[in-house]
Amino acid sequence: MGRGRVELKRIENKINRQVTFSKRRNGLLKKAYELSVLCDAEVALIIFSSRGKLYEFGSAGINKTLEKYNSCCYNAQGSNSALAGGEHQSWYQEMSRLKTKLECLQRSQRHMLGEDLGPLSIKELQQLEKQLEYSLSQARQRKTQIMMEQVDDLRRKERQLGELNKQLKNKLEAEADSSNCRSAIQDSWVHGTVVSGGRVLNAQPPPDIDCEPTLQIGYYQFVRPEAANPRSNGGGGDQNNNFVMGWPL
């Protein structure tokens, strides 16, 4: 039956701790020796006990291995330092270049503003004059372009307002005509006139006409007896028509 898994924590019992240290130390030294022999590796092992006692193993000697270790660490630190120094040098050169460019731009700006012109030669002043003329020309062109765009915008708004004003005017005229027509119709009903096609017609009923209605049946005409009286026509009425009391003979 195998042993259970050992819990990795400090052994509280002093005797057991000392026994375990001795066993594990001897095993570790044995493994270091086997590794150096089997793999032809340079192995160095240094152990200090809890009481400060030194135990060591070196396949090629502890001092030689330590010197080799220190040499490797120093070279690594030197290479890192060289890389850091080169990076710092690169940043310093970039900073110097940007600083020089900034000073040049500031000096050019002062010249554009008419400052510090004393040290400039005639050729430099002529070049500065050309630059100022070019800048002035560009500024004027840009100003003219902006003004033309604003004028076009104002004209477009003016056309829109004109169309809107025309629509409102037509709408008001149509509403006024409709209102006048309704008023005229109302007045016509009050005063007995009717407006038709722009003409005023009299809507009052015509006066009574003294006439007698007639009734025609077929091809015969009925006449009231008073109208058929021959005396009203000066006599001789019976001899001139074929009607007697409205009926044919």
From Swiss-Prot:
The keyword Transcription applies. CDD domains: MADS_MEF2_like (cd00265). It is found in: Nucleus. Disruption phenotype: No visible phenotype, probably due to redundancy with MADS6. Residues 228-249 are annotated as: Disordered. Expressed in the floral meristem, lodicule, palea, lemma, receptacle, empty glume, stamen, pistil, and ovule. Residues 88-178 form the K-box domain. InterPro entries: MADS-box/MEF2_TF, MEF2-like_N, TF_Kbox, TF_MADSbox, TF_MADSbox_sf. Its main location: nucleus. One of its GO terms (biological process) is positive regulation of transcription by RNA polymerase II. Residues 1-61 form the MADS-box domain. The keyword DNA-binding applies. One of its GO terms (cellular component) is nucleus. Pfam families: K-box, SRF-TF. One of its GO terms (molecular function) is DNA-binding transcription factor activity, RNA polymerase II-specific. Keywords: DNA-binding, Nucleus, Transcription, Transcription regulation. May interact with the K-box of MADS6. Probable transcription factor. Plays minor but redundant roles with MADS6 in floral development. This is MADS-box transcription factor 17.
